[in-house]
């Protein structure tokens, strides 16, 4: 190992990964993913789909998850800066409904590993950001789930100024809270 540093988070399973960066007068080189290094760090997943999105400042995406086809995700920022959040939705977890957030940026080059059964979202802090992520299952459009980003029962402390007008999809504006989600899982 030695090519990555792995920081465990307060919520079991979440990990912040910092790669080794090798720079000189030409620029830099880093491995964004090496199966052997990640396996040695306890992240032994097979990723089957890579995605990339671009967003402008104050875009908030999330909080998303797949219900019947949950995905582990490895997320990073290629350009710009975001505040990235995961919310524990694992049934029976001692930290169910708790959240963890981390700044991911092109400058700090950190990555965030999010296990299955977490809701995930981010807000763009820079003027523009490109966001890339690997998933362990394919996207299933009919299996989308979500929780509203500002659910007071979760209490995410988004680093956005009061009164900031967020840019969100209509779908993300309509998600219910974690209580509604929990109730729907009990009944469904």
Go through each PLM region and give its residues.
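Non-catalytic, conserved peripheral segments adjacent to functional cores
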Residues: 1-107, 126-128, 135-188
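Short beta-strand His + acidic residue motifs that chelate non-heme Fe in jelly-roll/DSBH
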Residues: 112, 120-125, 133
